[in-house]
């Protein structure tokens, strides 16, 4: 059963469970989980990012590269998880560490292609970066600044995320939570040509 809603121009259809006959939601939204998994895959390939996330000491970047098991523990559900495919991180106050979480938002049909097809959409892919204030300083600079730089290097301009199109930074804002004991950034990558 389709749920139909009207947008501000009263002519945009948003279908919740129907597809275009090729297994794809008409707005391309059925692949959110796959896109997040692919983004995590790209992030964990960045050795400097993994060191900054895993080691809570000022010399994090001069520490040894992480083992596959250490990286796996950072993304697997459990007490050592530091990379989440959703925004909420419940164990902030229990450990002095850094976290990455993500979400997708503001997806809508791309106006430029609307005359031809409603299968093209645009939206934002948000990455949230947080570090405990007690481990913020490193020998090379502020931890969250360095993490932001490595996330940017890993994802900006990337065009291989499962049909997601080319990513480009659209917005970046400071982010402070838990009574300012954790700080960092949110960075929004604009998805330029979802199909």
Residue map of PLM features:
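Residues in well-ordered beta-strands of folded domains
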Residues: 101-105, 128-130, 190
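"Short basic amphipathic alpha-helical interaction patches in structured regions
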Residues: 115-122, 139-148
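Short acidic, glycine/tyrosine-flanked loop/strand segments centered on an H-E-D-like triad
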Residues: 120-136
């Amino acid at each position: 059963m389709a749920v139909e809603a009207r947008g501000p121009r009263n002519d945009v259809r948003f279908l919740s469970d129907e597809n275009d006959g090729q297994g794809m939601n008409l707005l391309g939204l059925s692949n959110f989980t796959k896109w997040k998994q692919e983004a995590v895959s790209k992030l964990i390939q960045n050795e400097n990012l993994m060191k900054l996330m895993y080691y809570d000491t000022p010399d994090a970047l001069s520490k040894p590269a992480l083992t596959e098991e250490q990286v796996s523990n950072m993304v697997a559900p459990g007490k050592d998880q530091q990379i989440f495919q959703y925004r909420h991180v419940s164990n902030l106050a229990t450990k002095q560490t850094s976290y990455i979480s993500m979400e997708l938002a503001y997806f809508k049909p791309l106006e430029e292609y609307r005359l031809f097809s409603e299968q093209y959409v645009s939206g934002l892919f948000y990455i949230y970066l947080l570090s405990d204030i007690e481990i913020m300083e490193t020998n090379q600079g502020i931890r969250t600044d360095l993490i932001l730089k490595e996330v940017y290097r890993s994802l900006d301009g990337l065009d291989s995320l499962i049909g997601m199109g080319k990513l480009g930074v659209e917005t970046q804002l400071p982010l402070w939570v838990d009574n300012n004991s954790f700080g960092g950034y949110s960075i929004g990558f604009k998805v330029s040509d979802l199909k």
